[in-house]
Amino acid sequence: MKPGNLFFKVPIPAYVTRDEGSCFWRSESRGAFFMDFLVEKEKNMDRKLFTSECVTTGHPDKVADRISDSILDACLAQDPGSRVACETMVTTNFCLIAGEITTKARVDYAAVARRVIRDIGYTDPGLGFSDRDVEIQCRVHTQSPDIALGTNDQVGGAGDQGMMFGGACNETPELMPLPIAISRALTNRLTEKVGENPRLRPDGKAQVSVEYDEEGKPMGVDTVVVSIQHTEDYAMEDLRAFVKQEVIAPVLKDYGLDLSAVEHIYINPTGKFVVGGPDGDTGLTGRKIIVDTYGGYFSHGGGAFSGKDPTKVDRSGAYMARYMAKNIVAAQLADKCQVELAYAIGVAQPVSVRVDTYGTGKVSDEKLTQLLRDTFDMTPAGIIRTLDLRRPIYADTAARGHFGIQGKTWEKTDKAELLRSKAGL
């Protein structure tokens, strides 16, 4: 039933008029008011918007993530068996590194942090956070032997309890939801432009609202929001023109979209954004878990990724869940798929596996769940082996994103044909 026909099934009598500027109809004979369902735009009645955000590598929380993952990489480069749980806090010219690290590697944690800060672009002392002026303190000790008992190579159990989710859908070539895919592409391009435009600074954000039809298919981009730190002398008109033409337009074009079709574009909507980075907001490892995954499109188990070696199923389990979900969608067994894994500390096999295809599956969710159990090794040791996770590959995920990024082992679709064959399709 169309919105305009919700109440009025017959032509409106001549004595029924609408007050100018009102959304109500008046019956001149009765003085009654009726909601103006007739003139409400059908588009607005049916609109379904979903919004996701992403942040640049210079965002305070991402600075912390990247330091933690760079320390993890430095340990794995020398000792692939390193056990790392590294947390970082950054604020005005201060960086605290803490956590539990058991490794044979010899790593200068402070030197790693200083290099990361420099690489991100915080080199100007005037920013209130720079590689030269930052004070760095380390409070690191070894992993608890109680935890190590259940996660050693002989036992191969999970490093903690918890549930992890992975998802995929056919909205983009990388099989990611469109809102987070565009948001991440915008922030990655912003980061590139910071290196090219000396009046831009490292801290920034992007947010994208996508309109979906009644069947859940994306129709287009409704709203784009971009905020980027800048120098004091950068005229706002010039900044907005630069971001619109050099960042937003090319990214939309990559996804087959046109800038003119976006209903709302907001660039630095509050105006001035000079104070930023860790000088503007304190950053902590693991505080951008929705940015790191699917922008809220799929569920999240609550565990962060950065600073954790692959025996921590918060990270490796989520990577495996993405790998399995992506292969299901790549096999055209579903248009949209979420995989949930759950583990008990010290236990190798997951305590539960669940597939949800939101009614888009070509076979039942129960059959897909069994196919995953028959096809993939979901033990922590099996995940590490399958995805080759004992390598220094993690700082890049903190910088560019964990999912939908080419070259990651958990982004391969090498099991799609096998799954399709096993499903009998």
Locations of regions flagged by a protein language model:
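N-terminal, positively charged regions that mediate nucleic acid binding
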Residues: 45-85
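A short glycine-rich, hydrophobically flanked beta-strand micro-motif that places a catalytic Asp/Glu
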Residues: 82-86, 204-210, 263-267, 333-344
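Conserved phosphate/anionic-ligand binding catalytic regions in large, soluble enzymes, centered on
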Residues: 53-55, 59-64, 157-171, 274-298, ...
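Glycine-rich, mobile lid/loop segments that gate access to catalytic sites or pores
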Residues: 51, 111, 118-275, 404-407, ...
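Glycine-rich anion/phosphate-binding loop at the beta-strand->alpha-helix junction
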Residues: 234-328, 332
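Internal helix-turn-beta structural module
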Residues: 91, 336, 343-425
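Short, charge-patterned binding micro-sites
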Residues: 85-103, 345-349
